[in-house]
UniProtKB/Swiss-Prot annotation:
Cellular location(s): Mitochondrion
EC number: 6.2.1.5
Modified residues annotated as Phosphothreonine in this record: T341
PANTHER family (UniProt xref): SUCCINATE--COA LIGASE [ADP-FORMING] SUBUNIT BETA, MITOCHONDRIAL, SUCCINYL-COA SYNTHETASE BETA CHAIN
Pfam families: ATP-grasp_2, Ligase_CoA
Record-linked SUPFAM superfamilies: Glutathione synthetase ATP-binding domain-like, Succinyl-CoA synthetase domains
Residues reported in the UniProt entry to bind substrate: N323, G380, I381, M382
Name assigned to this protein: Succinate--CoA ligase [ADP-forming] subunit beta, mitochondrial
Residues annotated for ATP binding in this entry: K98, G105, R106, G107
GO CC entries: mitochondrion; succinate-CoA ligase complex
Subunit field text: Heterodimer of an alpha and a beta subunit. The beta subunit determines specificity for ATP. Interacts with ALAS2.
Family in the record: Belongs to the succinate/malate CoA ligase beta subunit family. ATP-specific subunit beta subfamily.
Single GO BP term: tricarboxylic acid cycle
């Protein structure tokens, strides 16, 4: 799925979790990346920092319907009885039941109920009720969810269509074109990553001037190149124009339709929709961001959002608390350079309070894999003494018993050092980032070795 080149630095970090983002943004590197189509224009692919909001399929489909885009008839059901009612109302001889989870690979997933597959075709309202009862309230396990799985709280019940042809269509932002780009392919209904790898020439791109907007001629030209029959090229282009309007209206970073089809009646339909929204637009897209399903997120991500912290949990054992995304990335890099593995990305921003620093420590220490913590602060806008007070408060309140290495530089750093020195806590201070990284890696290794030898080692604070 998906072909947005802008998964950015934060989303690149997310891939370190050993599972891929829900939309296959990794495909972008193949479709639009170093050896992909964009380089045919002599342009260097660049990245921007952003974090995307993903909505459930049924929510995305409702937005499409609102925009006048053609979609199959259907409705969300939050209980087996509702699934029965929707299937009966549709009146089709067969309907499709789709589990609503924010993870890819659902078709090949397995529910904790034992049901195989998150997309099922049923042939009666009674069967719709029976199948949905094995989905709703159950966890679905896919390659992307890992062993934790994702809870399915509702299903999408929709009419079954019999497509003559399937196509792929997407809109994303492409920095090297300085605006949006349409992406199309005659090979829809399959994994776009496979298409990009095996037949990259099957991927067609159409840049859009951000000031002029999409022209009907551009949409018509793309529809023709994608292979839509002449009698429905106009209809396909109309849907593309409506999707582009939706893309702009809601500050989307990606809209992916896979597949867009010509059905047995000759109509153009969008059978599936994945839409990502730029979190930077939350202040003006309240309608969209109120739809976020926190049951699909890590509990720590929810806590981080409530504390206004930028947090992404990873698979390592060294907790990181840093101000600024760039410095956070550099901190993680230098930890890796010295043989360590970061347990998280955590940017407290430039205006963090003592409360936020305490909440940041709560987030870090809620991960039982964390064996040591590195705090790396450069005080520009941020005042180092505020961070220091937060560290002292957190260590006392949370009774943290793992080693904490602190590197502070910048505004009011002397006050911060005095505060830490006078706290009576055993906080390991370093002026040099390289030295701090070496130290925290060594400390994590000591604790790891002790655990492997079944030796109980604790770093008592204070000593």
């Amino acid at each position: 799925m998906a072909a947005s080149v802008f998964y950015g630095r934060l989303l690149a970090v997310a891939t370190l979790r050993n599972h891929r983002p829900r939309t296959a943004l990794g495909a972008a590197a193949q479709v639009l990346g170093s050896s992909g189509l964009f380089n045919n224009h002599g342009l260097q692919v660049q990245q921007q920092q952003q974090r995307n909001l993903s909505l459930h399929e049924y929510m995305s489909m409702e937005l499409l319907q609102e925009a006048g885009v053609s979609i199959p008839k259907g409705c969300v059901a939050k209980s087996p009885d509702e699934a029965y009612a929707v299937a009966k109302k549709l009146g089709s001889k067969d309907v499709v039941i789709k589990a609503q989870v924010l993870a890819g690979g659902r078709g090949k997933g397995t529910f904790e109920s034992g049901l195989k597959g998150g997309v099922k075709i049923v042939f009666s309202p009674e069967e719709a009720k029976a199948v949905s009862s094995q989905m709703i309230g159950k966890k679905l396990f896919t390659k992307q969810t890992g062993e934790k799985g994702r809870i399915c709280n509702q299903v999408l019940v929709c009419e079954r269509k019999y497509p003559r042809r399937e196509y792929y269509f997407a809109i994303t932002m492409e920095r090297s074109f300085q605006g949006p780009v349409l992406i199309g392919s005659s090979q829809g209904g399959v994994n776009i990553e496979d298409v990009a790898a095996e037949t990259p020439e099957a991927i067609i791109t159409e840049p859009i001037d951000i000031e002029e907007g999409i022209k009907k001629e551009q949409a018509l030209q793309l529809a023709q190149k994608m292979g839509f029959p002449p009698n429905i090229v106009e209809s396909a282009a109309e849907n593309m124009v409506k999707l582009y309007s939706l893309f702009l209206k809601y500050d989307a970073t990606m809209i992916e339709i896979n597949p867009m089809v010509e059905d047995s009646d000759g109509a153009v339909l969008c059978m599936d929709a994945k839409i990502n929204f730029d979190s930077n637009s939350a202040y003006r897209q309240k309608k969209i961001f109120d739809l976020q399903d926190w049951t699909q997120e890590d509990e720590r991500d929810k806590d981080a959002a409530q504390a206004n912290l930028n947090y992404i949990g990873l698979d390592g054992n060294i907790g990181c608390l840093v101000n600024g995304a760039g410095l956070a990335m550099a901190t993680m890099d230098i930890i890796k350079l010295h043989g360590g593995t970061p347990a998280n990305f955590l940017d407290v921003g430039g205006g963090a309070t003592v409360h936020q620093v305490t909440e940041a420590f709560k987030l870090i220490t809620s991960d039982k894999k964390v064996l040591a913590i590195l705090v790396n602060i450069f005080g520009g806008i941020m005042s180092c003494d505020v961070i220091a007070q937060g560290i002292v408060t957190a260590l006392k309140d949370l009774e943290i018993k793992i080693p904490v290495v602190v590197r502070l530089q910048g505004t009011r750093v002397d006050d911060a050092k005095a505060l830490i020195a006078g706290s009576g806590l055993k906080i390991l201070a370093c002026d040099d980032l390289d030295e701090a990284a070496r130290m925290v890696v060594k400390l994590s290794e000591i604790v790891t070795l002790a655990k492997q030898a079944h030796v109980d080692v604790k770093f008592q604070l204070p000593i």
